[in-house]
């Protein structure tokens, strides 16, 4: 975590932290004004929101990075597919070398590597083989391609809360219950893209990492969610569900990590959560190498971590599935026996019924309305 991010996520920065962040206060004011103006233009219809021709469920958040949107998007897409829907996920494709519109998966299998699609689309395509994944900055264009070319009849807009150019039928906002707003400021003074009052646009709040939140904070967030949306929130925890090797093949039970000395490799917005997951699985983390979010690992970086892990007596270098898809496949396959990958999913603790009801309402709202029968002519 960089020095700036440390300032962002420290909820009580103290005098030194406040002093270090003071110069950014001048930049926060114009960002706040620009965000408010943009929101008002969408609210009043001056800036239009395009209808996709299919129900749209947006998964987003208020802060930058690390809230748990990807597991939530996986869960929502899987639930829609389980209802028989032809689902397509629309993603910005952060970390990709290309910025044009592209199809990462057509629903029959992955078509692009992470270097071209971005790590999150590549992961989503791998985890949801029956779901199409499209990526690019213009999500309305992606939606049109998904509906017209791929036959999608339900769309999941990944990281879409601020992307208001595409109309949606349900806005799901994911908050990290353990630290939802950081220092409370907007960019660049803090991590938030919008103030918490923007939650009034949401249809559902999803509290990730609810198991790590203090009881009094959890109650306050539940009240905030109900006040903003009229619904109780969904609550989840990040649960490790599988252990893979460097080639992303099953590699036995997660119990294999218990008591093992390991090196942790990650390129995440908030790597501390990954370290906590490893410790909860009983692993002894002898060293940790954290790179910036969406970082594409080079051969030299991977070799250095493997070498340092060997020197520290580590059985394996362990990384996340989101990081593993960014590794060069040939490099990862060559080091498959020395790498382990922990798969993490969102395990719902509360609110599964609330989520299902919200999806029901979104699908019903987007359903074509029958035309009234023509009136009989008056004789």
Swiss-Prot record:
Organism source for this protein?
Anaeromyxobacter dehalogenans (strain 2CP-1 / ATCC BAA-258)
What is the superkingdom listed in this entry's lineage?
Bacteria
Q: Which Pfam families match?
A: LpxK
Q: What keywords were assigned to this record? A: ATP-binding, Kinase, Lipid A biosynthesis, Lipid biosynthesis, Lipid metabolism, Nucleotide-binding, Transferase
The pathway entry for this protein reads as:
Glycolipid biosynthesis; lipid IV(A) biosynthesis; lipid IV(A) from (3R)-3-hydroxytetradecanoyl-[acyl-carrier-protein] and UDP-N-acetyl-alpha-D-glucosamine: step 6/6
Q: Which Gene3D superfamilies match?
A: P-loop containing nucleotide triphosphate hydrolases
What is the official name of this protein in its record?
A: Tetraacyldisaccharide 4'-kinase
Per its record, what are the GO molecular function terms? ATP binding; tetraacyldisaccharide 4'-kinase activity
Binding locations of ATP: 63-70
Family designation: Belongs to the LpxK family.
Catalysis performed (reactions): a lipid A disaccharide + ATP = a lipid IVA + ADP + H(+)
């Amino acid at each position: 975590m960089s020095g700036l991010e440390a300032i962002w996520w420290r909820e009580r920065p103290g005098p030194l932290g406040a002093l270090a962040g003071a110069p950014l206060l001048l930049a926060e004011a114009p960002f706040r004004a620009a965000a408010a103006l943009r929101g008002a233009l969408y609210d009043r219809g001056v800036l239009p929101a395009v209808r996709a021709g299919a129900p749209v469920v947006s998964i987003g958040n208020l802060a930058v990075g690390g809230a748990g949107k990807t597991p939530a998007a996986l869960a929502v897409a899987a639930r829609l597919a389980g209802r028989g829907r032809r689902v397509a996920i629309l993603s910005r494709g952060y970390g990709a070398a290309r910025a044009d519109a592209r199809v990462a998966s057509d629903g029959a299998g992955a078509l692009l590597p992470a270097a071209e699609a971005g790590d999150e689309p590549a992961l989503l395509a791998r985890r949801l083989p029956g779901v199409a994944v499209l990526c690019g900055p213009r999500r309305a264009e992606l939606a049109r391609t998904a509906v017209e070319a791929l036959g999608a009849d339900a769309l999941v807009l990944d990281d879409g809360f601020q992307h208001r150019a595409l109309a949606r039928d349900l806005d799901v906002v994911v908050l990290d219950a353990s630290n939802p707003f950081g220092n409370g400021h907007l960019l660049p003074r803090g991590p938030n893209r919008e103030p918490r009052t923007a939650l009034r646009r949401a249809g559902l709040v999803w509290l990730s990492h609810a198991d790590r939140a203090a009881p009094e904070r959890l109650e306050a967030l539940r009240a905030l969610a109900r006040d903003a949306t009229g619904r109780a929130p969904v609550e989840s925890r990040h649960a490790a569900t599988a252990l893979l090797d460097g080639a992303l093949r099953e590699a036995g039970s997660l119990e294999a990590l218990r008591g093992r000395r390991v090196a942790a490799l990650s390129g995440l917005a908030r790597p501390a959560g990954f370290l906590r997951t490893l410790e909860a699985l009983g692993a002894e983390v002898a060293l940790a190498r954290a790179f910036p979010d969406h970082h594409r690992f080079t051969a030299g970086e991977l070799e250095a971590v493997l070498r340092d892990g060997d020197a520290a007596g580590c059985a394996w270098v362990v990384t996340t599935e989101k990081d593993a898809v960014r590794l060069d496949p040939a490099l990862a396959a060559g080091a498959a026996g020395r790498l382990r990958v922990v798969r993490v999913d969102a395990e719902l603790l509360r609110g599964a019924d609330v989520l299902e009801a919200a999806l029901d309402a979104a699908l019903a709202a987007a359903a074509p309305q029958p035309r009234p029968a023509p009136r009989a002519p008056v004789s």
